[in-house]
């Protein structure tokens, strides 16, 4: 790809005019969440970005991915068209009528994006089976790149997690059966030089003094590797440990490996690129020793799905400790694998590392053993359900079945809204219909811009060959809508499920309650789906590439929905009125501004050095007779709403965390069976109102809400600017925030 000599940019005069015309639709938490999540540090100005600067960066980073600009002499008409599109995108995103994924808000338009094409995609999927590294940016030197290796999917996972992405991975029986037996017991030694600032801490984690070890083991045969101070170095270290256990990647049967961690930067050192500070080598030491111990215990045996998940979880745990604030994993096992389904009941292992993934099981439409799964869900909210058969054979359920619809699907991203092939990422943009209409957009125009934004992301330079190949083949996009419940009430005055009728399931003979859907909402959603498909086809024709295999989704949203103050994805508001508690680092200069504006602030009872700020929130249409919250809407209506969106809107999948009351637990198995031909993926959690101190969300009544609001005055943004003379501090984030309602995704 040629480098552009003159990329498309947005003129300062244009941006100034937009700022006069359009007011961003900030939610109650919007500006504060943005400032501590997506506003990048500007070293020359010694402050973080303002919203218009973020949007400018994001739009310019995206529009210039259009491959027609990467030629010696781009067509002037193409340049003019894209320049106009960039202006419209700026208006759409600046007003918060729609936004790309949190990953794009953080990375698009940065040097990091240019170096790491993977960085624009939030989440990925990989199958745990031996795979070749191929022409990828990370390839072990000990064997040909064409050699299938057990380490490859774990290297892919480790790499993408450290770039801030989430990873779904499959440990279903068909994949696990392809893993060879563990052949070699490995004596792993991690050494460190005394000149390392991490020397003392590393010894505590199990490393040994390099000089002393070399003196005591002079002349011994062992593989040695000095790890470089890079992300790739961490990945390759883990690959070496795994590879030494298997015959195909350790044909000599070498039983000793020495890894030198002296060059890894110490805790607190700057991390350039993605941002943040280093953890030091200590988490890496712990992970390498734990994984080696696990594999040594299986010599002469095949790994189980639990073993394979444990390795993934140990990697995820390390990434969290390595200063990527959240590591999102979803492990997909077989529905008849009892050990996998119950693996989190081992409390010791759960607290050590098994917390690192949400676990789901793969089913098909013939599966009918829902009772054990329903009991497990009622107990701890897992496993989730993923119907791979539906994902492969259907786009929208309303459209005809086709065995070639999406035949390569093997799993999903951690939140379950995108059906994915091996090595494939999700690629998201969401529109907030209520905000878009309020700001004068025709919804067809907003969704067309969304489709084109996502399409351009597929032309990034991807680091892994497995990803490049499948992205070029599928060009998958995921245009989502969020604030769906707000939209239904605002534009149609009612929820989409108008009632239920009793019918007999022709396969089971059981009586079920079939939902009745509002025809006007159905027509509107169906029309917008075809808008996205048509926009993708037109753009694909112009670019000379394949149309996207699938186009639409409902992402769970979360942080991005907070920006605009809308309901999250298809989810119902948590309550009509509530206190939302946000945790800040104790030295955050936003805290004095929030205090000056009257927000209640108190120390976090769980974490030292953290402050909790209370934000009173009123859901849109909270007083509407048709309003329902997650605490009042039935489990049946939630699943029926998900089924509606899977039928008429999403050709990928619909991410939904269905909440249920204790008295509804006995309905879970029946509902999962009833919708086995409709719902591609779902998860369920018991509804928790405010069962512990400083809960993130606490339902309140309208009187309490008004009392809380009466104490608040002024603009936090304005007060912050005055107090800090338009300066800020670097590397501050909100604590324990996630990019989705279910908590599975990284924040950015």
Swiss-Prot record:
Activity regulation, short description: Allosterically regulated by ATP and dNTP.
Stretches for region Adenosylcobalamin-binding-2: 692-733
Location of region: Effector region-2: 172-320
MF terms from GO for this chain are:
cobalamin binding; nucleotide binding; ribonucleoside-diphosphate reductase activity, thioredoxin disulfide as acceptor; ribonucleoside-triphosphate reductase (thioredoxin) activity
Show the segment(s) annotated as Adenosylcobalamin-binding-1: 572-633
The catalytic residues are: 415, 417
Similarity annotation: Belongs to the class II ribonucleoside-triphosphate reductase family.
NCBIfam families given in the database record: RTPR
- The protein here is known as Adenosylcobalamin-dependent ribonucleoside-triphosphate reductase
């Amino acid at each position: 790809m040629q480098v552009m000599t003159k990329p498309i940019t947005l003129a300062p005069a244009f941006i100034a005019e937009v700022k006069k015309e359009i007011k961003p639709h900030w939610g109650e938490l919007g500006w504060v969440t943005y400032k501590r999540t997506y506003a990048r540090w500007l070293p020359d100005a010694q402050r973080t970005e303002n919203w218009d600067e973020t949007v400018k960066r994001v739009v310019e980073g995206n529009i210039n991915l259009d491959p027609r600009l990467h030629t010696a002499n781009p067509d002037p008409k193409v340049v003019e068209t894209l320049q106009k599109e960039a202006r419209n995108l700026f208006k759409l995103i600046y007003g918060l009528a729609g936004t790309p994924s949190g990953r794009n808000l953080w990375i698009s338009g940065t040097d990091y994006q240019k170096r790491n094409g993977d960085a624009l995609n939030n989440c990925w999927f990989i199958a745990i089976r031996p795979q070749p590294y191929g022409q990828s940016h990370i390839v072990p030197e000990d064997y040909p790149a064409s050699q299938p290796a057990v380490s490859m999917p774990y290297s892919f996972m480790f790499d993408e997690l450290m770039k801030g992405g989430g990873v779904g991975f499959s440990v279903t029986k068909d994949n696990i059966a392809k893993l060879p037996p563990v052949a070699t017991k490995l004596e792993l030694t991690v050494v460190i030089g005394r000149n390392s600032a991490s020397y003392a801490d590393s010894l505590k984690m199990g490393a040994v003094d390099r000089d002393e070890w070399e003196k005591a083991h002079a002349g011994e045969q062992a593989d040695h590797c000095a790890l470089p101070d890079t992300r790739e170095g961490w990945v390759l270290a883990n690959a070496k440990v795994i590879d030494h256990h298997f015959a195909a990647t350790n044909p000599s049967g070498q039983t000793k490996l020495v890894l030198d961690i002296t060059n890894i930067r110490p805790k607190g050192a700057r991390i350039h690129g993605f941002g943040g500070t280093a953890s030091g080598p200590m988490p890496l030491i712990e992970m390498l020793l734990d994984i080696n111990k696990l594999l040594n215990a299986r010599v002469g045996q095949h790994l189980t799905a639990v073993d394979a998940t444990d390795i993934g979880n140990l990697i995820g745990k390390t990434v969290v400790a390595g200063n990527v604030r959240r590591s999102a994993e979803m492990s997909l096992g077989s529905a008849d694998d009892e050990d996998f389904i119950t693996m989190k009941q081992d409390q010791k292992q759960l607290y050590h590392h098994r917390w690192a993934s949400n676990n789901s099981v793969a089913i098909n439409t013939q599966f009918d053993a829902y009772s054990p799964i329903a009991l497990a869900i009622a107990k701890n909210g897992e496993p989730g359900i993923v119907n791979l058969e539906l994902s492969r054979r259907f786009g929208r359920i309303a459209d005809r079945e086709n065995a070639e619809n999406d035949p390569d699907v093997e799993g999903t991203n951690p939140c379950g809204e995108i059906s994915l092939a091996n090595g494939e990422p999700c690629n998201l943009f969401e529109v907030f219909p209520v905000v878009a209409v309020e700001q004068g957009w025709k919804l067809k125009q907003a969704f067309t811009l969304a489709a084109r934004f996502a399409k351009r992301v597929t032309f990034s330079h991807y680091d892994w060959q497995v990803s490049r190949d499948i992205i070029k083949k599928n060009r998958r996009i995921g245009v989502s809508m969020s604030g769906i419940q707000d939209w239904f009430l605002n534009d149609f005055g009612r929820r989409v499920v108008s009632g239920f009728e009793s019918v007999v399931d022709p396969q089971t003979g059981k009586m079920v309650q079939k939902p009745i859907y509002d025809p006007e909402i159905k027509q509107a959603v169906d029309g917008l789906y075809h808008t996205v498909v048509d926009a993708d086809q037109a753009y694909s024709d112009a670019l000379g590439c394949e149309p996207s295999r699938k186009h639409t989704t409902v992402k769970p949203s979360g942080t991005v929905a907070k920006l605009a103050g809308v309901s999250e994805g298809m989810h119902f508001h948590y309550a009509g009125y509530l206190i939302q508690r946000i945790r800040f680092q104790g030295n955050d200069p936003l805290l004095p501004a929030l205090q000056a504006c009257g927000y209640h602030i108190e120390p976090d009872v769980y974490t030292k050095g953290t402050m909790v700020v209370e934000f009173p929130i009123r859901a849109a249409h909270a007083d509407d007779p048709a309003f329902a919250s997650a605490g009042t809407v039935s489990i049946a209506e939630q699943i029926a709403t998900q089924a509606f969106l899977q039928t008429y809107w999403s050709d990928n999948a619909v991410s939904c965390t269905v909440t249920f009351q204790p008295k509804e637990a006995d309905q879970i198995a029946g509902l999962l069976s009833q919708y086995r031909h409709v719902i591609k993926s779902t998860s369920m959690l018991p509804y928790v109102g405010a069962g512990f101190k400083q809960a993130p969300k606490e339902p309140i009544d309208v009187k309490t809400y008004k009392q809380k609001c009466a104490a608040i005055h002024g603009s936090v943004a304005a007060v912050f600017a005055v107090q800090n003379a338009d300066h800020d501090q670097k590397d501050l984030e909100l604590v324990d925030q996630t990019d989705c309602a279910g908590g599975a995704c990284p924040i950015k």
